[in-house]
Swiss-Prot record:
Stored PANTHER family: ZINC FINGER PROTEIN ZAT5
Compositional bias per record (Polar residues), positions renumbered to this chain: 154-171
Organism the protein comes from: Arabidopsis thaliana (Mouse-ear cress)
Chain intervals annotated as zinc finger (C2H2-type): 115-137, 190-212
GO biological process: regulation of DNA-templated transcription
Entry function: Probable transcription factor that may be involved in stress responses.
This protein's UniProt keywords: Metal-binding, Nucleus, Repeat, Transcription, Transcription regulation, Zinc, Zinc-finger
Pfam families in alphabetical order: zf-C2H2_6
MF annotations from Gene Ontology: DNA-binding transcription factor activity; transcription cis-regulatory region binding; zinc ion binding
InterPro entries to which the protein is assigned, alphabetical: Znf_C2H2_sf, Znf_C2H2_type
Region (Disordered): 1-28, 40-60, 131-171
Name assigned to this protein: Zinc finger protein ZAT5
Localization per record: Nucleus
Tissues where this protein is expressed: Expressed in flowers and siliques.
UniProt gene name: ZAT5
Length: 286
């Protein structure tokens, strides 16, 4: 009986070793437990019938569903790991809402910066654009506040202060008069001497005077010719008188037929020549 059990145990160990090389490591614990159950059952059974029972129980114990369940879990685990490796981490909402001075966005070939304004949270692609935008925030705003009004009741001043105030009043009135004179000069009205029209500038008055000049020149042709003829006759008379006067100045009252006196020749050369008012006539018996 003991020999039979030893043979069955050796056969089982050979079967277990052969199966262990083909199966995975995870199912080894189950095989060992199955082997212990087989050995316990084989001790109660005897002969060739016991060996068949051991082999049937072992085959039933080491069944395919158990191995498929183990491999399915490992496959699920591997799939989960692959999905985690391929997945991307989504940014949290806190990082999206946080303000950044600038952030770098890199691409395959180039990279650029985004600059954000701290006041209005606008973004710009360059620092120069951000500087120009910041200048709009720094512009001085027009103050709408009214000036403080002086109190109605002023404290009483001394005599010296009153004198100074009167002096300031006089000087202020003089300045006001000078300013009014300047304004009057600036607003001087130019008046036409012919028709009395008033103009604010000398250029306008000059343009107006041209009308009067053109009106004077546009006279009737008959009156114009009469006036021209009268003017021409007067001018001719004046010209003739002028010519006669010039001729009298050129020709002296000298008679060349009179001989020079001998006494005058003996005198000095620098003595002036004297002419008689009524020269004597030669060969005149009257």
């Amino acid at each position: 009986m003991m020999m039979g059990q030893d043979e069955v145990g050796s056969d089982q160990t050979q079967i277990i070793k052969g199966k262990r090389t083909k199966r995975q490591r995870s199912s080894s614990t189950f095989v060992v437990t199955a082997a212990t159950t087989v050995t316990s059952t084989s001790s109660s059974a005897g002969g060739s019938g016991g060996e068949r029972a051991v082999s049937d129980e072992y085959n039933s114990a080491v069944s395919s569903p158990v191995t498929t369940d183990c491999t399915q879990e490992e496959e699920d685990m591997a799939i989960c790991l692959i999905m985690l490796a391929r997945g991307t981490v989504l940014p949290s909402p806190d990082l999206k809402n946080s303000r950044k001075i600038h952030q770098k966005i890199s691409s395959e070939n180039s990279s650029f910066y985004v600059y954000e304004c701290k006041t209005c949270n606008r973004t710009f692609s360059s620092f120069q654009a951000l500087g120009g935008h910041r200048a709009s925030h720094k512009k001085p705003r027009t103050s709408t506040e009214e000036k403080t009004r002086l109190p109605l009741t002023q404290p009483k001043s001394s005599a010296s202060e009153e004198g100074q105030n009167s002096h300031f009043k006089v000087s202020g009135s003089a300045l006001a008069s000078q300013a009014s004179n300047i304004i009057n000069k600036a607003n001087k009205v130019h008046e036409c001497s012919i028709c009395g029209s008033e103009f604010t500038s000398g250029q306008a008055l000059g343009g107006h005077m041209r009308r009067h000049r053109t009106a004077v020149t546009t006279i009737s042709p008959v009156a114009a010719t009469a006036e021209v003829s009268r003017n021409s006759t007067e001018e001719e008379i004046e010209i003739n008188i002028g010519r006669s006067m010039e001729q009298q100045r050129k020709y002296l009252p000298l008679d060349l037929n009179l001989p020079a006196p001998e006494d005058d020749l003996r005198e000095s050369k620098f003595q002036g020549i004297v002419f008689s008012a009524t020269p004597a006539l030669i060969d005149c018996h009257y």
